[in-house]
Amino acid sequence: MSHRKYEAPRHGSLGFLPRKRSANIRGRVKSFPKDVKSKPVALTAFLGYKAGMTTVVRDLDRPGSKMHKREIVEAATVVDTPPLVVVGVVGYVETPRGLRSLTTVWAEHLSEEVRRRFYKNWYKSKKKAFTKYSAKYAQDGAQVERELARIKKYASVVRVLAHTQIKKTPLAQKKAHLAEIQVNGGSVSDKVDWAKEHFEKTVSVDSVFEKDEMVDVAAVTKGHGFEGVTHRWGTKKLPRKTHRGLRKVACIGAWHPANVQWTVARAGQNGFHHRTSINHKVYRVGSAGDESSGATEFDRTKKTINPMGGFVRYGNVKNDFMLLKGSIPGVKKRIVTIRKSLYVDTSRRATENVNLKWIDTASKFGKGRFQTPAEKHAFLGTLKKDLEK
């Protein structure tokens, strides 16, 4: 019988404790990129809905690598990003204890889908949210202008309140997601003027992100419920003849201190945690309404980004979309927050110019053989179900 080790590295990271369910379904952003006043005014983040994943083929542009100028196959994620609607602006002042909210100015009219966010039960409510606030505009708007002037005078950070247009997605939910997004570039006065000009107007994703940019994605991961210690922490299974179970921790601590330490791996909630995945390269920013949104210079097939039959458990993307490298946290239909990278990545992977050669649009349900309905019809001919009865 071989000997056993006396010491071993611990299983699982303690850096993500507590491993409990996230309090909010939307990915929260606590930090934004550094403000550069010489750049034009623009948003630093965007909201979208995870639609699904696909496969892309491209030539690797990495001199010195054995795969340089050779085809590689990569996984990519499609995020449905309908335009955001700006409905407010918030000013923050710097204090010794950090940023403090100075005041918030809302737009005159708010749509029903965002007003639903302020009610737990919209059907039984009186639906009077923001009716008194809108009266400030009905008078002369002087009070609103005074609040905007306060932000220009005292604030050092300006963020806008923007909500998604969830009615443009295949989701059954009617309540839009609302978020604060920092505005960078220009002076504080320029930021406030930009926010006021965009009240009740839409901002598209192509005005925030561009191709080959590095972004971070904040979202809530897929939930797995109550899981055992072996799956939750990756601890080693015990030998076959172990009494009272194998997928357990044999020793959960010494006699004294007479309690279980917080560092000991235990069973509990796994998944549905808030996570931020950094450094995803933007492969494409396009519109699903474009009939060639899924085509490339190499593949001239007239097809959209949607696979045949739509994305499984999501449907068809009908708005602007982003194609990101790799996988991102969350399940399909989950709201995700996409933010500009906090630092400038100068690695070759980040600065590489990506030219996609092929985007897979075959059915994601089963083993898809055809890229377009026309290709399927050309191969199978007219099917019996398509004939007029």
UniProtKB/Swiss-Prot annotation:
<dbReference type="GO" id="GO:0000027">
    <property type="term" value="P:ribosomal large subunit assembly"/>
</dbReference>
<dbReference type="GO" id="GO:0003723">
    <property type="term" value="F:RNA binding"/>
</dbReference>
<dbReference type="InterPro" id="IPR000597">
    <property type="entry name" value="Ribosomal_uL3"/>
</dbReference>
<protein>
    <recommendedName>
        <fullName>Large ribosomal subunit protein uL3</fullName>
    </recommendedName>
</protein>
<dbReference type="Pfam" id="PF00297">
    <property type="entry name" value="Ribosomal_L3"/>
</dbReference>
<dbReference type="InterPro" id="IPR044892">
    <property type="entry name" value="Ribosomal_L3_dom_3_arc_sf"/>
</dbReference>
<keyword id="KW-0963">Cytoplasm</keyword>
<keyword id="KW-0687">Ribonucleoprotein</keyword>
<dbReference type="GO" id="GO:0006414">
    <property type="term" value="P:translational elongation"/>
</dbReference>
<dbReference type="GO" id="GO:1990145">
    <property type="term" value="P:maintenance of translational fidelity"/>
</dbReference>
<dbReference type="InterPro" id="IPR009000">
    <property type="entry name" value="Transl_B-barrel_sf"/>
</dbReference>
<dbReference type="GO" id="GO:0006364">
    <property type="term" value="P:rRNA processing"/>
</dbReference>
<dbReference type="InterPro" id="IPR019926">
    <property type="entry name" value="Ribosomal_uL3_CS"/>
</dbReference>
<dbReference type="InterPro" id="IPR045077">
    <property type="entry name" value="L3_arc_euk"/>
</dbReference>
<dbReference type="GO" id="GO:0022625">
    <property type="term" value="C:cytosolic large ribosomal subunit"/>
</dbReference>
<keyword id="KW-0689">Ribosomal protein</keyword>
<comment type="similarity">
    <text>Belongs to the universal ribosomal protein uL3 family.</text>
</comment>
<dbReference type="GO" id="GO:0003735">
    <property type="term" value="F:structural constituent of ribosome"/>
</dbReference>
